[in-house]
């Protein structure tokens, strides 16, 4: 009888542990996938993508530029993710869902505003740090206060998953920027920028509406 009870207790505990593990895995996947998609969309036509085109056209060395973008993004988004995770401990999930929804809708409107490179980023392009160093400096500066950095803060605060969000936002940045680096400015003028921006803006508004109603968030 005692042996049977112990077996049942172990079975119940095992099932609960399995369910908890599955839920945690689902949350990690959700944070990673949503972060990847959101940032990849936000990066379309962004000043950092323009910067990738400028650096690729000037230096014509894709590999050190790609590595520079990766390092700058990891450092910048790690800080943003840490801030977001900390903010997430201060407010309720309902408030964070609303904040994320507003962020998505705001990014949808923001993405319609054309981005240009400012003087500080242009100066960073002319540093004597080499291709890799110039890319790290320029990209890090360009990301400060950018919509993808703000998105990282909001996503980390919403999902409470630092590594999943930072990995996702970094992958999203690379998905958007690596093709731009490889192609350089060779085909940039042929892209229907306004159409692409419009589609991305609509998708962000849809994501914002989904977040408001708790669909998938």
Predicted regions and their residues:
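Membrane helix-loop-helix hairpins that form the core translocation module of multi-pass transporters
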Residues: 30, 60-130, 182-190, 196-202, ...
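Short, Lys/Arg-enriched N-terminal segments with co-localized hydrophobic residues
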Residues: 11-27
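Juxtamembrane transmembrane-helix termini in multi-pass membrane transport proteins
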Residues: 27-92, 151-170
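Juxtamembrane boundary at the C-terminal end of a transmembrane helix
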Residues: 210-217
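Selected transmembrane alpha-helices and immediately adjacent juxtamembrane segments
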Residues: 121-149, 155
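Hydrophobic/aromatic residues within the transmembrane alpha-helices of Major Facilitator Superfamily
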Residues: 40, 44, 74-75, 109, ...
């Amino acid at each position: 009888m005692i042996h049977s009870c112990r077996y049942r207790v172990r079975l119940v505990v095992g099932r609960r542990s399995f369910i908890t593990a599955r839920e945690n895995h689902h949350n990690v996947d959700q944070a990673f996938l949503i972060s990847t998609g959101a940032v990849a969309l936000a990066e379309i036509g962004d000043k950092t993508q323009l910067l990738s085109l400028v650096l690729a056209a000037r230096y014509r060395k894709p590999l050190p530029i790609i590595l520079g973008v990766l390092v700058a993004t990891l450092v910048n988004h790690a800080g943003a993710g840490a801030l977001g995770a900390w903010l997430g401990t201060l407010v309720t999930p309902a408030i964070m869902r609303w904040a994320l929804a507003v962020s998505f809708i705001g990014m949808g409107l923001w993405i319609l505003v054309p981005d240009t490179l400012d003087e500080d980023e242009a100066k960073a392009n002319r540093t004597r740090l080499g291709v890799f160093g110039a890319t790290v400096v320029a990209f890090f500066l360009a990301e400060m206060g950018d919509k993808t950095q703000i998105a990282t803060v909001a996503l980390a605060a919403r999902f409470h998953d630092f590594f999943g969000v930072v990995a996702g936002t970094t992958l999203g940045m690379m998905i958007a920027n690596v093709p731009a680096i490889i192609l350089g400015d060779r085909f940039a003028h042929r892209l229907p920028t306004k159409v692409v921006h419009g589609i991305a803006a609509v998708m962000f508004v849809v994501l914002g509406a989904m977040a408001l109603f708790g669909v998938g968030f």
